[in-house]
């Protein structure tokens, strides 16, 4: 039967279900809106959309690496109980795989992509909400790739392989031996998870972060009652320490504190006989 578009709109307004689901429900119920509402409830779709408005404070981070490209994403749930649910974990890993395949970081665009068997990703998430019984929210996606080099990742305290609460991926561009580069890249990813840098280099650190820290330090040193030129040197010294805390290239490497990350890269370049460039990294921490 042909379904009235106004009936679809009314049913969608009442239930929050998608256009396709509303059309199917009305078709199955011969256009009867009340019966269609019942149909959607029975199918769990209306329930899923209702739950999709609930707050989410837990979840999982997943990574998927394939040679010179990789993806990381964060999917939130309401509780840790669901985060440890096998069905939820499978969904998150599948989404990471698809993010790496599609190489799409925009959530809205990604949700429209095919999941499997003509089902899009958004519909699959809604289906899981209905079955699992908690809201599930795809929070963010990060994708990296290099033409020559590797992308590697690390998950801290994984629940299963490539799945946990904190993770990072990093892209290294180089023409050196791939296997040796992978080992180094994984060490960098582990370092990123441990130190949680705010930026790759000083040049890309948010100016607002710099200005805020400088203002805090300035207020601290004003009480020292020293000449302005001396105070400026003190401020510069403390800012240098701050950069060493928040800028990846300025940080002391956790596995060898004799070197900063920048110095370690130069050392590795000599060792492996090729230039190495950290193109970018992505660090995801649940609800941060």
UniProtKB/Swiss-Prot annotation:
HAMAP family: EF_Ts. PROSITE patterns: EF_TS_2. One of its GO terms (cellular component) is cytoplasm. Residues 79-82 are annotated as: Involved in Mg(2+) ion dislocation from EF-Tu. Pfam families: EF_TS. GO terms for molecular function: translation elongation factor activity. Associates with the EF-Tu.GDP complex and induces the exchange of GDP to GTP. It remains bound to the aminoacyl-tRNA.EF-Tu.GTP complex up to the GTP hydrolysis stage on the ribosome. It is found in: Cytoplasm. InterPro entries: EF-Ts_dimer_sf, Transl_elong_EFTs/EF1B, Transl_elong_EFTs/EF1B_dimer, Transl_elong_Ts_CS, UBA-like_sf. It comes from Ehrlichia ruminantium (strain Gardel). Belongs to the EF-Ts family. This is Elongation factor Ts. Keywords: Cytoplasm, Elongation factor, Protein biosynthesis. SUPFAM superfamilies: Elongation factor Ts (EF-Ts), dimerisation domain (SSF54713), UBA-like (SSF46934). The gene is tsf.
């Amino acid at each position: 039967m042909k379904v009235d578009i106004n009936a679809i709109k009314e049913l969608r307004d009442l239930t929050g279900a998608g256009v396709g689901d509303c059309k199917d429900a009305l078709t199955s119920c011969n256009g009867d809106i009340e019966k269609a509402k019942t149909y959607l409830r029975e199918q769990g779709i209306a329930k899923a959309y209702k739950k999709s408005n609930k707050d989410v404070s837990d979840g999982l981070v997943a990574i998927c690496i394939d040679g010179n490209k990789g993806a990381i994403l964060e999917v939130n749930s309401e509780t840790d109980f669901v985060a440890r649910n096998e069905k939820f974990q499978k969904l998150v890993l599948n989404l990471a795989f698809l993010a790496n395949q599609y190489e799409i970081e925009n959530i809205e665009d990604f949700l429209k992509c095919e999941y499997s068997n003509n089902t899009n990703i958004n519909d699959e998430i809604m289906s899981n909400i209905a079955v699992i019984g908690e809201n599930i929210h795809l929070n963010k996606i990060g994708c990296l790739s290099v033409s020559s080099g590797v992308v590697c990742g690390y998950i801290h305290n994984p629940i299963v392989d490539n799945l946990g609460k904190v993770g990072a991926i990093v892209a290294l561009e180089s023409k050196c031996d791939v296997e040796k580069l992978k080992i180094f890249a994984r060490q960098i990813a582990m370092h990123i998870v441990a130190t949680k840098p705010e930026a790759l280099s000083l040049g890309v650190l948010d100016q607002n972060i710099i200005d805020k820290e400088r203002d805090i330090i300035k207020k601290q040193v004003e009480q020292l009652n020293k000449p302005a030129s001396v105070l400026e040197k003190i401020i510069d010294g403390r800012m240098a320490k701050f950069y060493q805390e928040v800028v990846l290239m300025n940080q002391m490497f956790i596995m060898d504190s004799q070197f900063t990350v920048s110095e370690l890269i130069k050392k590795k370049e000599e060792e492996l006989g090729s230039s190495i460039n950290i193109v970018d990294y992505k660090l995801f921490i649940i609800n941060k």
